[in-house]
Amino acid sequence: MIFSALAIVLPAQAVEQFRQLKATEISAKFTGMEMTDEVHWAKVFSKDGTYISYSMGVKRGGKWRVTKDELCIDLSNPNFQDHCYQVWLSGNRVQLRETGIEIFDEGILQKPIPRNL
């Protein structure tokens, strides 16, 4: 009987909750890192503010910055607006959420992987 109660309680405690990051935390976590779904896309946040995205074999460049507790991406393309996201973290899992939009990007943070495109 005691074993059954522990089996139910332990998995619930092991699950980490996502929490929203502040500006200094965003900079510390993203600088020099890559966010990826490990299959289809990756977003690289270089130390010099350069942003590179790889998606389905297409490479795009731009700049990234942190403004008012949000991660902002400028794709340096007049056809794309700058986007700023709230950053939510749980372990190495990260979510980029836009205010007022329920769909968000989710992936992991890791050291950048070299790519040839």
Where would I find each of the regions flagged by the language model?
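Bacterial N-terminal signal peptides
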Residues: 1-7
